[in-house]
Amino acid sequence: MLKKIGLSAFTLSLATLGMIPLAQASGDWKIQADAQGMYAQYSGSSTRKNISSEGVLLRADYLDSGGFALGTTATQLQFKASTLTQQGVYASANKHLYLDALPGVLTLRMDGHYISNNDVTGSSNRVKVYAPQVSFLNYRKSFYADLGYAYSSYPKGLSVSQLTPTLGLGFNQAADWLQMRVYWVKPSNAAQAQNTSSTTALESKWTHWFAPSSAWIPQKMDVGALFGQRIYAVDGDAAAVYNIADVQQGSISLASQWRISESAHVMLAAGNERYRNKFISETYDSRYIYLDVKGAW
């Protein structure tokens, strides 16, 4: 597995992030900057040792109208015989629509990714991803739905189509949020995708917000799990592209976020992801730790 980390591997969608504002902006624009890093150790792999990634992201929102985000990442995948280095860039724009016929906000969003690396096979280099999404969040912020699509263009004629319907529900007086997302992924050539013609997976995330009485108590906690299989996936919430052809067979994660000031937060997360390389009949795990520091003004 090699993925490009982005906004945060454990955030909810941009719409549900509005449930807890990071800070009050002094003007019409609200700016948020993220610095993040990830380190993972592989277990059970005969070819991989570890992977690390660092990234920065800047997001700007104009009043309640919409906004944009720009980010970049650098990734190092340490094989037992070599090292792969990768650069990724990310851009996103969204527009909020307020229609009289709808009891909430309709959001149109477009993401783009470009990934380059020194893969000697050339199969994961110069990857382009286009990912539109339409979402709805009611005014009570207790119901969310979206439909996302991603088209990924790989070298050697491979393309990957992905459809991701999502449902989110708030409950317990807005202290809890449950989100479910289905991943339907279809590569154009099974021979370039571990002899897999399509994959289906269900991703679930539960978030609980606390009312911390001290800085040591988390502001919120996230628990996530992935069931089923997916390959060449594009994660819109995490702004991540899984651009090496191993089949992900599930994952589990735990994350906590602390509020360290009126406009600054720290998130720490850990998890385990399982993968299968069918070509060499090998199943292995990636155990990772993730840190995200964000500030807003």
Provide a role label for each language-model segment.
Residues 25-297:
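Transmembrane beta-barrel domains of bacterial outer-membrane proteins
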